[in-house]
Amino acid sequence: MAAKDVKFGDSARKKMLVGVNVLADAVKATLGPKGRNVVLAKSFGAPTITKDGVSVAKEIELKDAFENMGAQLVKEVASKANDAAGDGTTTATVLAQAIVNEGLKAVAAGMNPMDLKRGIDKATAAVVAELKNLSKPCADSKAIAQVGTISANSDNSIGEIIAEAMEKVGKEGVITVEEGSGLENELSVVEGMQFDRGYLSPYFVNKPDTMVAELESPLLLLVDKKISNIRELLPVLEAVAKAGRPLLIVAEDVEGEALATLVVNNMRGIVKVAAVKAPGFGDRRKAMLQDIAVLTGGQVISEEIGLTLETTTLEHLGNAKRVILSKENTTIIDGAGVDADIEARVKQIRAQIEETSSDYDREKLQERLAKLAGGVAVIKVGAGTEVEMKEKKARVEDALHATRAAVEEGVVPGGGVALVRALAAIVDLKGDNEDQNVGIALLRRAVEAPLRQITANAGDEPSVVADKVKQGSGNYGYNAATGEYGDMIEMGILDPAKVTRSALQAAASIGGLMITTEAMVADLPEDKPAGGMPDMGGMGGMGGMM
């Protein structure tokens, strides 16, 4: 085992503080509407230019092991805030830096670190509760667009496209972000339920110009097994032919004689039919078939519940207004399912999302939820160069997380004002002893840090602005983009309450741990012997110089 270097007390904390400040100073330059860019060198390719706090934090590693520990702990603050709300990383870093700097001063002055931490925790809980009281629901598109704009570093086009996407697919809908091919951002929306399985045979295509199969007002047969024998299907096909409506078969697979017969019947016009494989695998396939059944008001034909193809009647089939099958995808538009059943299914999937611990499962469940509840929107990000594209895509993803957080827990006035207003909750707060009171006072100063940093980045005097904002009330604050004071919500400067809350909780948590640090252990750097000079080689051929 390698030898270790151990530092104690103030010497350890001083080293840690250097690391905290190096990382936080790089990250906080990006905060606010007039935040600066940070250029990140890559080991290959062009450097990346970003205004995203977490991207800057991820790149920083320091040579000194003890300083690096401080930097990595602040990086953890940014990651925690990002995981909880998808945004607020820079705010969390600024808060953590303020808490650690103030806290270590108090420890150096002889305060009890554990009591300081208890005071900070008490004050944090009170501020979080007050933020909840200050938050207002984020209901309309205008508010959603404003939140998106602020999170995307004051880019209006991003805020507007996210609001439009949410309007089209609903609050529960899936919105994905992809790299586009043009200069402008584009939005495309998939109506109805789409899954990634295409027609089983190109002979089902009835629109040769677009190579899709379109069925108007079809019946849907949903089967959770392979169909290879046409005799099983005959009773259903005859009933559908009599009804004079098209049929879509969704099964584990349709093969051999069964597929050939369906193709022949379709081409001769006896019965208009198309077949597609069921989406997903294993248990997920069964669940997705059940989703389609609920959406279309049909039943899954499964031997597990005593239903077979031979006994299937028209009552077991689902209905939809239209189905479109391409080579890769199938879209079911306007299923005839009962609203109450769909709502119950949505509730069930939501409960599963709450229970699951796997990120992959959660993502798949959310996709299923969106297909039932709303739809799927794709934002294609446009940019002039690849460097700009990466930077812009990261900002769109941030803004999307922020708007989701706003819909979830409401919005508070932005620009660091909400934290200053939440101070009202801790004006009269008292701890159990004097050291806890110092912890509470310490947090009181720290929560002003984001407002001060936004002001400093805009080139104004932080103390003057902070005092003026504190004298105001309600949503009164400072708009760093224009240099004006006024109602932040009316000026469209909003933050999701969840983002502000998560940033403060992450900063107080890690900040409290760093204040109570007494020893640090790191690997000793290995002493490598200095290499000798390389052999100079012969110097022949210089004989006739005399």
UniProtKB/Swiss-Prot annotation:
InterPro entries: Chaperonin_Cpn60_CS, Cpn60/GroEL, Cpn60/GroEL/TCP-1, GroEL-like_apical_dom_sf, GROEL-like_equatorial_sf, TCP-1-like_intermed_sf
GO molecular function, one term: unfolded protein binding
Positions of ATP binding: 30-33, 51, 87-91, 415, 479-481, 495
Pfam families tied to this protein: Cpn60_TCP1 (PF00118)
SUPFAM superfamilies: GroEL apical domain-like (SSF52029), GroEL equatorial domain-like (SSF48592), GroEL-intermediate domain like (SSF54849)
Keywords in alphabetical order: ATP-binding, Chaperone, Cytoplasm, Isomerase, Nucleotide-binding
Quaternary organization: Forms a cylinder of 14 subunits composed of two heptameric rings stacked back-to-back. Interacts with the co-chaperonin GroES.
Role description: Together with its co-chaperonin GroES, plays an essential role in assisting protein folding. The GroEL-GroES system forms a nano-cage that allows encapsulation of the non-native substrate proteins and provides a physical environment optimized to promote and accelerate protein folding.
Name listed for the protein in its UniProt record: Chaperonin GroEL
Lineage summary: Bacteria, Pseudomonadati, Pseudomonadota, Gammaproteobacteria, Pseudomonadales
Gene transcribed to yield this protein: groEL
